[in-house]
Amino acid sequence: MPGKIENGTPKDLKTGNDFVSAAKSLLDRAFKSHHSYYGLCSTSCQVYDTAWVAMIPKTRDNVKQWLFPECFHYLLKTQAADGSWGSLPTTQTAGILDTASAVLALLCHAQEPLQILDVSPDEMGLRIEHGVTSLKRQLAVWNDVEDTNHIGVEFIIPALLSMLEKELDVPSFEFPCRSILERMHGEKLGHFDLEQVYGKPSSLLHSLEAFLGKLDFDRLSHHLYHGSMMASPSSTAAYLIGATKWDDEAEDYLRHVMRNGAGHGNGGISGTFPTTHFECSWIIATLLKGGFTLKQIDGDGLRGLSTILLEALRDENGVIGFAPRTADVDDTAKALLALSLVNQPVSPDIMIKVFEGKDHFTTFGSERDPSLTSNLHVLLSLLKQSNLSQYHPQILKTTLFTCRWWWGSDHCVKDKWNLSHLYPTMLLVEAFTEVLHLIDGGELSSLFDESFKCKIGLSIFQAVLRIILTQDNDGSWRGYREQTCYAILALVQARHVCFFTHMVDRLQSCVDRGFSWLKSCSFHSQDLTWTSKTAYEVGFVAEAYKLAALQSASLEVPAATIGHSVTSAVPSSDLEKYMRLVRKTALFSPLDEWGLMASIIESSFFVPLLQAQRVEIYPRDNIKVDEDKYLSIIPFTWVGCNNRSRTFASNRWLYDMMYLSLLGYQTDEYMEAVAGPVFGDVSLLHQTIDKVIDNTMGNLARANGTVHSGNGHQHESPNIGQVEDTLTRFTNSVLNHKDVLNSSSSDQDTLRREFRTFMHAHITQIEDNSRFSKQASSDAFSSPEQSYFQWVNSTGGSHVACAYSFAFSNCLMSANLLQGKDAFPSGTQKYLISSVMRHATNMCRMYNDFGSIARDNAERNVNSIHFPEFTLCNGTSQNLDERKERLLKIATYEQGYLDRALEALERQSRDDAGDRAGSKDMRKLKIVKLFCDVTDLYDQLYVIKDLSSSMK
């Protein structure tokens, strides 16, 4: 087995010693904070749980009083000027939960002030009015309901709204996504039999507040553990509110939370208590993976926290959760990793038996969707096993799951347990660096083929590059302390990987600037990144991340050797040659050298994937065309523009568009070199195109049956049947693409129309070229059937692949971003996106022609400059330079209209979405602009050099 990835030595011994002392202090303080009965918890106070605890009444000696008046006063202190209880930029749902629960608590106190007499009814009325107004405002613009991963939100918010409607004596709250919420509620409830809650433990016990009046709480007392319902103060509060028999143990638990939680008696209640196992494992693993050695931080604190984990795994039969009796794969895997790092390994076999699913590990029993970070924690724990080969199937499964997740993630990768994309990104870099290290050493080389290794390398490279590209000028990532730590830890890990050799100075500069910002950052600035019912910070864990980031960043830079077995990371000579052209374009000439090189390296990971599909549709070896050198540059055109604009479209979208670009070139060549000559009679070829498209649309099963490799035709002269078979494969690959079939019917119809037009335009172009080639002179097209304007807006423009590719992209957005809804729903949006497509297509044709004049003249192909409008002006013949100048002016005109159409589309999309304009509305526009950037890049490259293969 290869040696472990070694950290360097501290650059500054004094600084290193300071960090070691601080780490040992953290471990000691965390261990001493552990209560033998109630456990350990440093999670921040949450309004939501505070509100529920504020609603607990208790009757003593026939006198009813509020049990925790401090919580009520905490709510008064934390209400914002706008009536809400705060908001987070990363989640609307948390703000709605906080505001709704706090308003409900105020309503309860307004109706029964009981012993609290220092707040006037007028003030209470005003606070409630402002709170309700804020809640309605938040509900009106709520657009992340389907994306939210807050625990139990499908149960809790409907219950809260129902309670508020009853207390306020108002009809139902109406808001745009109410039907979506109700559907989610019904689907989630369908997974549970409420009667079973009285027997075995269930995740519903964590959210009992959603079931007040629906369950007999007196039958739930046996589920209490050390006074809590699944370590949830809000659920425990609901139990005390709903049960007819008072439970002193539950009251004692809440009093302990009040006194010893992050609020320290000020009325604030932690959202989860305790978080013993979570904090023990995260603190240990974070420090030891973050540059501290076991020898440096060994002591009572480290040994004490390790013992807590060992005893928990023993007492709970090999699987644990964030607290006792809350088993999940996340905390189990992290505990196994932590114990491996302190040389006290525990077998992962029980974890695998309990949580392994068909294609991923589940976090716990019933969950709406899987967790990326849970699977990464499993992978990291398995990679530390001494008998690695025993766990090859699980390592393969979690690696494949992670690759697929990253491949399909648009913009930022998301996870259900942390609001920051940087957390799963950090874990991915950490895990995949270790995977590559083991591949290099031979331990995992048999598990992964070249394509898989390509995707592992690509995932690491993109993760690190995007962290670098999104660092703020002050050295932080959006001014958040813990998220900046995640970024630094990922970058430090990347210093071991050879892919980053060409940009190591930039990488180190990012680490240094992050280090400086972090050292000056106050410990009092909260970063609420962890999710439960709302969002919270874990004090000790945040401190561990800060120390790990500072320590790892201060170590000497090691030699970057990991990843040498992934040969795709080395750009081809063809790609490097084309980069000299790219540097001359207006889009990329302002870019720093390192940034351009980074996109070149990222592109190189896609090239082998594209090469593997090179002859899937079209045979090439027996076709009289030059070598397809464009294959090397296609990935860069998409990757470079993606990074330049910081769009970060999914690899799924990027690769599909790359492949479509490849097919566009190949179709052009095939129609000219094979289909046209084989058919001879172009009218028959027109009929064949219609038949192929109609059959593909009408008989998916038949179309699927024709999909096979083009290799079968490459050593024989093609006949009409073989051409039809090839065109059927191509048509099927576009119109019956999985995501196209999952897109809206309107977007599919548009693609079908544009594709049919594209195919027929090729045949018409063949006819035009045939007539042109028979002319005595190749200087001017003497028999055009249309004016230049008509031609470029029909045959000429449609002949390039731009329009149908645009429609294809819209189908991908419909399927993957918009759950099968129209990419552009209103009539105005549809018109404007069509205008964008038309102007982009016309530009593409014009610039393509500008760059291919010499080739078209040699091959006698019709070019824009051959039309009479260019050859003559006021009866005077125009020379080549004059024609090119006029063509560029018209192309510039089209560019202006394209820009205006894009602006109008953006305005209209915002107007149609109104206040509920969310991330998906903005994402589709970003992707449209990215597509236009790629088109623009091709246009600029065509001006510099013709990219198409020449006919032999």
Curated annotation (Swiss-Prot):
Disruption phenotype: Impairs the production of gibberellins. Its EC number is 4.2.3.19, 5.5.1.13. Pathway: Plant hormone biosynthesis; gibberellin biosynthesis. A motif (DXDD B-type cyclization motif) lies at residues 328-331. Induction: Expression is induced under gibberellin-producing conditions. It catalyses: ent-copalyl diphosphate = ent-kaur-16-ene + diphosphate; (2E,6E,10E)-geranylgeranyl diphosphate = ent-copalyl diphosphate. One of its GO terms (biological process) is gibberellin biosynthetic process. A motif (DEXXE A-type cyclization motif) lies at residues 668-672. One of its GO terms (molecular function) is ent-kaurene synthase activity. Mg(2+) 2 binds at residues 668, 672. Keywords: Isomerase, Lyase, Magnesium, Metal-binding. Mg(2+) 3 binds at residues 848-849, 852, 856. Its cofactor is Mg(2+). Mg(2+) 1 binds at residues 668, 672. The Asp-Asp-Xaa-Xaa-Asp/Glu (DDXXD/E) motif is important for the catalytic activity, presumably through binding to Mg(2+). Bifunctional ent-kaurene synthase; part of the gene cluster that mediates the biosynthesis of gibberellins (GAs), diterpenoids that may provide a selective advantage during infection of the preferred host plant, rice. Gibberellins (GAs) are diterpenoids and are synthesized via the mevalonate pathway. Biosynthesis of the major metabolite GA3 (gibberellic acid) from geranylgeranyl diphosphate (GGPP) requires 13 steps. Belongs to the terpene synthase family. This is Bifunctional ent-kaurene synthase. The lineage of its organism: Eukaryota, Fungi, Dikarya, Ascomycota, Pezizomycotina. The gene is CPS/KS.
